[in-house]
Amino acid sequence: LSEEPHPMISIVGALAFGSVIAGRRYRSVNANWTAMHYVLAAPSGVGKNYIKSGINRLLHASGLEDFFGANFYTHASAVYWALNSAPTHICVTDEFGDSFAEARKSENGNKMTVFKAMKQVYSDVDDMFRADAYSMSGLSKKDREEKKMPAVVIPSLTLLGLTTPGQFYNEIKANHIEGGMMNRYVVFNLGRDNVKTKRKMGNGIPSESMVSKVREVRHLDSAPRDYAFDARPNFIEVEFTEEVVAIFSRFKDE
Protein backbone atom coordinates (compact mmCIF):
# COMPACT_ATOMS: atom_id res chain seq x y z
CA LEU A 1 0.00 0.00 0.00
CA SER A 2 2.82 2.42 0.80
CA GLU A 3 4.89 4.14 -1.88
CA GLU A 4 7.91 4.11 0.44
CA PRO A 5 7.55 1.02 2.63
CA HIS A 6 9.82 0.43 5.60
CA PRO A 7 10.85 -3.25 5.84
CA MET A 8 10.58 -3.30 9.64
CA ILE A 9 7.03 -1.94 9.53
CA SER A 10 6.10 -4.89 7.34
CA ILE A 11 7.77 -7.27 9.80
CA VAL A 12 5.91 -5.78 12.78
CA GLY A 13 2.64 -6.04 10.87
CA ALA A 14 3.33 -9.68 10.03
CA LEU A 15 4.15 -10.49 13.67
CA ALA A 16 0.97 -8.84 14.91
CA PHE A 17 -1.14 -10.55 12.26
CA GLY A 18 0.37 -13.93 13.07
CA SER A 19 -0.30 -13.35 16.75
CA VAL A 20 -4.01 -12.82 16.21
CA ILE A 21 -4.76 -15.56 13.66
CA ALA A 22 -2.97 -18.13 15.82
CA GLY A 23 -4.71 -16.97 18.99
CA ARG A 24 -6.43 -19.70 21.05
CA ARG A 25 -5.37 -22.18 18.35
CA TYR A 26 -1.69 -22.86 19.13
CA ARG A 27 0.03 -23.35 22.49
CA SER A 28 3.62 -24.34 23.19
CA VAL A 29 4.63 -27.21 25.44
CA ASN A 30 5.61 -24.51 27.95
CA ALA A 31 2.10 -23.03 27.94
CA ASN A 32 2.99 -20.07 25.71
CA TRP A 33 0.20 -18.63 23.57
CA THR A 34 0.58 -16.24 20.66
CA ALA A 35 -1.16 -13.11 21.99
CA MET A 36 1.50 -10.39 22.22
CA HIS A 37 1.57 -6.68 23.00
CA TYR A 38 3.62 -4.69 20.49
CA VAL A 39 4.51 -1.00 20.34
CA LEU A 40 5.79 0.54 17.11
CA ALA A 41 7.51 3.87 17.79
CA ALA A 42 8.37 5.72 14.59
CA PRO A 43 8.27 9.31 13.33
CA SER A 44 5.28 10.63 11.44
CA GLY A 45 5.17 9.97 7.73
CA VAL A 46 6.89 6.57 7.59
CA GLY A 47 3.70 4.58 7.00
CA LYS A 48 2.79 3.15 10.41
CA ASN A 49 -0.92 3.24 9.64
CA TYR A 50 -0.55 0.94 6.64
CA ILE A 51 -0.25 -1.90 9.15
CA LYS A 52 -3.77 -1.18 10.35
CA SER A 53 -5.22 -1.21 6.84
CA GLY A 54 -3.35 -4.36 5.85
CA ILE A 55 -4.39 -6.39 8.90
CA ASN A 56 -7.99 -5.21 8.64
CA ARG A 57 -8.30 -6.07 4.95
CA LEU A 58 -6.70 -9.49 5.27
CA LEU A 59 -8.86 -10.49 8.25
CA HIS A 60 -12.00 -9.40 6.39
CA ALA A 61 -10.97 -11.25 3.23
CA SER A 62 -10.39 -14.39 5.32
CA GLY A 63 -13.81 -14.23 6.99
CA LEU A 64 -12.31 -13.24 10.34
CA GLU A 65 -13.57 -9.66 10.47
CA ASP A 66 -14.60 -9.94 14.13
CA PHE A 67 -10.95 -10.64 14.98
CA PHE A 68 -10.26 -6.95 14.29
CA GLY A 69 -11.25 -5.09 17.44
CA ALA A 70 -11.92 -1.49 18.38
CA ASN A 71 -9.36 1.29 18.00
CA PHE A 72 -9.01 1.34 21.80
CA TYR A 73 -11.07 0.90 24.96
CA THR A 74 -12.80 3.44 27.18
CA HIS A 75 -12.78 1.46 30.42
CA ALA A 76 -11.71 -1.89 31.87
CA SER A 77 -15.25 -3.18 31.37
CA ALA A 78 -14.90 -2.42 27.65
CA VAL A 79 -11.88 -4.73 27.53
CA TYR A 80 -13.92 -7.48 29.15
CA TRP A 81 -16.91 -7.11 26.82
CA ALA A 82 -14.65 -6.97 23.76
CA LEU A 83 -13.18 -10.34 24.77
CA ASN A 84 -16.62 -11.64 25.66
CA SER A 85 -17.75 -10.89 22.10
CA ALA A 86 -14.49 -11.91 20.40
CA PRO A 87 -12.15 -13.88 22.70
CA THR A 88 -9.53 -13.70 19.96
CA HIS A 89 -8.97 -10.24 18.51
CA ILE A 90 -6.40 -7.56 17.81
CA CYS A 91 -6.48 -3.93 18.87
CA VAL A 92 -4.46 -1.71 16.53
CA THR A 93 -4.49 1.70 18.17
CA ASP A 94 -3.23 5.00 16.79
CA GLU A 95 -1.53 7.61 18.98
CA PHE A 96 -0.75 5.03 21.64
CA GLY A 97 1.51 7.50 23.42
CA ASP A 98 -1.41 9.92 23.80
CA SER A 99 -3.45 7.19 25.48
CA PHE A 100 -0.53 6.70 27.87
CA ALA A 101 -0.59 10.41 28.65
CA GLU A 102 -4.36 10.43 29.20
CA ALA A 103 -4.11 7.49 31.58
CA ARG A 104 -1.61 9.37 33.75
CA LYS A 105 -3.97 12.31 34.23
CA SER A 106 -5.90 12.06 37.47
CA GLU A 107 -9.05 13.22 35.72
CA ASN A 108 -8.97 10.24 33.35
CA GLY A 109 -9.18 7.30 35.71
CA ASN A 110 -11.18 5.32 33.14
CA LYS A 111 -8.24 5.16 30.75
CA MET A 112 -5.97 3.97 33.55
CA THR A 113 -8.31 1.04 34.20
CA VAL A 114 -7.86 0.06 30.54
CA PHE A 115 -4.10 -0.35 30.91
CA LYS A 116 -4.56 -2.28 34.15
CA ALA A 117 -7.06 -4.59 32.46
CA MET A 118 -4.78 -5.20 29.47
CA LYS A 119 -1.92 -5.99 31.82
CA GLN A 120 -4.14 -8.52 33.56
CA VAL A 121 -5.33 -10.05 30.28
CA TYR A 122 -1.71 -10.57 29.28
CA SER A 123 -1.05 -12.41 32.54
CA ASP A 124 -4.22 -14.49 32.22
CA VAL A 125 -3.52 -15.75 28.70
CA ASP A 126 -3.22 -19.36 29.92
CA ASP A 127 -6.00 -19.01 32.45
CA MET A 128 -9.18 -16.93 32.82
CA PHE A 129 -9.75 -13.18 32.70
CA ARG A 130 -12.36 -11.92 35.14
CA ALA A 131 -13.97 -8.50 35.08
CA ASP A 132 -14.03 -6.28 38.14
CA ALA A 133 -17.02 -6.93 40.38
CA TYR A 134 -19.63 -4.25 41.01
CA SER A 135 -21.86 -3.95 44.04
CA MET A 136 -25.15 -5.83 43.71
CA SER A 137 -26.54 -4.66 47.01
CA GLY A 138 -30.30 -4.34 46.85
CA LEU A 139 -30.69 -6.32 43.62
CA SER A 140 -33.03 -9.27 43.33
CA LYS A 141 -31.67 -12.77 42.75
CA LYS A 142 -32.87 -12.60 39.14
CA ASP A 143 -31.12 -9.28 38.53
CA ARG A 144 -27.94 -10.60 40.10
CA GLU A 145 -27.95 -13.60 37.77
CA GLU A 146 -28.46 -11.34 34.75
CA LYS A 147 -25.55 -9.12 35.75
CA LYS A 148 -23.08 -11.95 36.23
CA MET A 149 -19.98 -11.61 34.06
CA PRO A 150 -18.49 -15.07 33.38
CA ALA A 151 -14.73 -15.33 33.04
CA VAL A 152 -13.14 -15.28 29.58
CA VAL A 153 -11.21 -18.53 29.18
CA ILE A 154 -7.81 -18.24 27.46
CA PRO A 155 -8.24 -14.56 26.49
CA SER A 156 -6.29 -13.75 23.34
CA LEU A 157 -5.85 -9.99 23.01
CA THR A 158 -3.10 -8.91 20.63
CA LEU A 159 -2.19 -5.24 20.99
CA LEU A 160 -0.34 -3.11 18.46
CA GLY A 161 0.22 0.44 19.63
CA LEU A 162 1.32 2.93 16.98
CA THR A 163 3.07 6.06 18.25
CA THR A 164 5.83 8.56 17.69
CA PRO A 165 8.89 8.13 19.95
CA GLY A 166 8.28 11.40 21.78
CA GLN A 167 4.64 10.60 22.51
CA PHE A 168 5.55 7.26 24.01
CA TYR A 169 8.86 7.68 25.83
CA ASN A 170 8.01 11.04 27.39
CA GLU A 171 5.13 9.39 29.25
CA ILE A 172 6.95 6.36 30.65
CA LYS A 173 7.43 6.63 34.40
CA ALA A 174 9.18 4.43 36.95
CA ASN A 175 5.91 2.87 38.11
CA HIS A 176 5.25 1.59 34.58
CA ILE A 177 8.47 -0.43 34.81
CA GLU A 178 8.14 -1.46 38.45
CA GLY A 179 4.51 -2.45 37.97
CA GLY A 180 5.35 -4.76 35.08
CA MET A 181 3.54 -2.87 32.34
CA MET A 182 6.61 -2.17 30.21
CA ASN A 183 7.82 -5.76 30.59
CA ARG A 184 4.80 -6.89 28.60
CA TYR A 185 5.56 -4.74 25.56
CA VAL A 186 7.77 -5.69 22.64
CA VAL A 187 8.88 -2.26 21.43
CA PHE A 188 10.19 -1.52 17.94
CA ASN A 189 12.01 1.80 17.36
CA LEU A 190 12.23 2.94 13.75
CA GLY A 191 13.81 5.93 12.05
CA ARG A 192 13.48 7.25 8.52
CA ASP A 193 16.36 5.18 7.22
CA ASN A 194 15.95 1.94 5.26
CA VAL A 195 12.85 3.24 3.49
CA LYS A 196 12.43 1.59 0.09
CA THR A 197 10.84 3.27 -2.93
CA LYS A 198 8.38 1.08 -4.84
CA ARG A 199 7.98 1.61 -8.56
CA LYS A 200 4.85 -0.51 -8.70
CA MET A 201 2.03 -0.06 -6.23
CA GLY A 202 -0.25 -2.88 -5.14
CA ASN A 203 -4.05 -2.56 -5.22
CA GLY A 204 -4.46 -3.31 -1.53
CA ILE A 205 -6.58 -6.41 -2.17
CA PRO A 206 -5.30 -9.54 -0.38
CA SER A 207 -4.30 -12.27 -2.82
CA GLU A 208 -6.04 -15.63 -2.87
CA SER A 209 -2.82 -17.32 -1.78
CA MET A 210 -2.62 -15.11 1.32
CA VAL A 211 -6.24 -15.78 2.25
CA SER A 212 -5.71 -19.50 1.67
CA LYS A 213 -2.69 -19.50 3.98
CA VAL A 214 -4.65 -17.72 6.73
CA ARG A 215 -7.42 -20.29 6.49
CA GLU A 216 -4.84 -23.08 6.60
CA VAL A 217 -3.11 -21.68 9.71
CA ARG A 218 -6.46 -21.17 11.42
CA HIS A 219 -7.72 -24.61 10.28
CA LEU A 220 -10.98 -23.01 9.17
CA ASP A 221 -11.96 -25.99 7.01
CA SER A 222 -11.85 -28.46 9.90
CA ALA A 223 -12.38 -26.43 13.07
CA PRO A 224 -14.62 -23.59 14.24
CA ARG A 225 -13.43 -20.03 13.67
CA ASP A 226 -13.12 -19.76 17.44
CA TYR A 227 -14.56 -21.32 20.57
CA ALA A 228 -17.01 -19.65 22.94
CA PHE A 229 -15.47 -17.11 25.28
CA ASP A 230 -16.25 -19.25 28.33
CA ALA A 231 -15.04 -22.55 26.83
CA ARG A 232 -11.50 -23.88 26.84
CA PRO A 233 -10.45 -24.11 23.19
CA ASN A 234 -9.03 -27.21 21.57
CA PHE A 235 -5.50 -26.25 20.63
CA ILE A 236 -2.51 -27.56 18.72
CA GLU A 237 0.53 -28.12 20.93
CA VAL A 238 3.82 -26.90 19.51
CA GLU A 239 7.24 -28.28 20.45
CA PHE A 240 10.37 -26.14 20.61
CA THR A 241 13.19 -27.29 18.35
CA GLU A 242 16.75 -27.52 19.69
CA GLU A 243 17.68 -24.47 17.62
CA VAL A 244 14.92 -22.40 19.22
CA VAL A 245 15.89 -23.53 22.73
CA ALA A 246 19.47 -22.47 21.98
CA ILE A 247 18.27 -19.01 20.90
CA PHE A 248 16.27 -18.65 24.11
CA SER A 249 19.33 -19.61 26.13
CA ARG A 250 21.50 -17.01 24.38
CA PHE A 251 18.84 -14.37 24.95
CA LYS A 252 18.73 -15.13 28.69
CA ASP A 253 22.52 -15.00 28.90
CA GLU A 254 22.51 -11.51 27.40
Predicted segments with their positions:
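Phosphate-handling catalytic cores of nucleic-acid transaction enzymes
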Residues: 1-254
